[in-house]
C-alpha cells in the first residue's frame, strides 16, 4: 500500500496517505492483452484496427465495472498511436500515456448523465468540426449515453450520419434498450 506510519504532534503513530490510489485504478489495464474477460471486445477491435476498418461509432454495453471506459481508452490509444494504429502500443508512447491518464486534448470523456441537454450536444457537434490538436483522431467517449435526452440524441444523429473523417465516437451504457434505435443502428456493437 502507498501508506506509511508517521508521528503526530503527541508522538502517536498515525497512518498517512500521500499517494493512495483505488485498486481498480491502480490495476487498470494498460494494453488490450491485459483486459480480462473481454476477449470478444479485444478480438473485434483488434480486427478493425488490423484491417484498417475503424468505424466512426462504437457502442459498448455491459454491467458496471466490466471495462467499458477502459476499453474505450485502450481503443483511443491504439488508433492514435504515433506510428499508426496498432493493438499493442509501447509503454513509452507519450500520447498513449496521456490518453490513459485522461490528459489528452483529443480524447474527450463526457458523462452522459450530467451533460445530457440538447445544447451541450449541439456544442459537441460544433466542436467536432475542428481538427485534432495532437492525435490522428478526435475521440468522444460518452459514458452513460442512455441518460441523454430524446432531443440530445436527435441533435447527435446528424453528426453520426455524416461524421467528419477525423472524429470517432465511443458510447458506453449499462442500458442499451434506452438508447434510440436510430443511434444504435449507426454504431458498431
Task: Outline where the language-model segments fall.
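P-loop/Walker A NTP-binding region and its immediately flanking N-terminal helices
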Residues: 2-189
